[in-house]
Amino acid sequence: MKRRCMGIFLVLCMTLSLLPATASATENGVAINETNFPDALFREKVAEYDKNNDGVLSDTEISNIRSISINGDSSKGGDVTDLKGIEYFTSLTRLQCGHNKISKLDVSKNTALTELYCPNNELTELDLGNNTALGQLTVTNNQLKELDISCLLYTSPSPRDYAA
């Protein structure tokens, strides 16, 4: 009986010693789930970057993502409506998300972003916050009433600014 109790105790200790390793794996990455990426189509796209298919984007996997293209295509099951989770991709330099049904987009944490292409959405809010590296911005055919681009270091007038 004493041996059996000691055996159970050892098994419990060994099992508990494995728990911190499992917890740290999610602490050093982002789980690909409905909480972090609520939009199913965006979550599906994000899963393509999970090279080891463990359901978690590691810090290394995240830092290797420079470009995301998720343009709408109704023939492939609909449009993206929410890009919540885009803030995790801090090395992102190019985001293409045109022809969807996105109404709010916050890329203020994507400070490496140099190119943002999101025409033909339903954008009413676009937060460019700290995007001083942004060089190309396309937001035509949206519902934006105003757009603060004061964070940009250089802006050039569009051709329509010269129209008679």
Enumerate the predicted regions with their spans.
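Sec-dependent N-terminal signal peptides of Gram-positive bacterial secreted proteins and lipoproteins
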Residues: 4-22
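Conserved hydrophobic position(s) of the canonical leucine-rich repeat
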Residues: 65, 92, 102, 113, ...
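Single conserved hydrophobic/aromatic residue that forms the stacking wall/gate
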Residues: 154-164
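N-terminal capping/linker segments that flank leucine-rich repeat
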Residues: 16, 21-94, 111, 132
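Concave beta-strand-loop units of leucine-rich repeat
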Residues: 69-76, 97-101, 118-122, 139-143
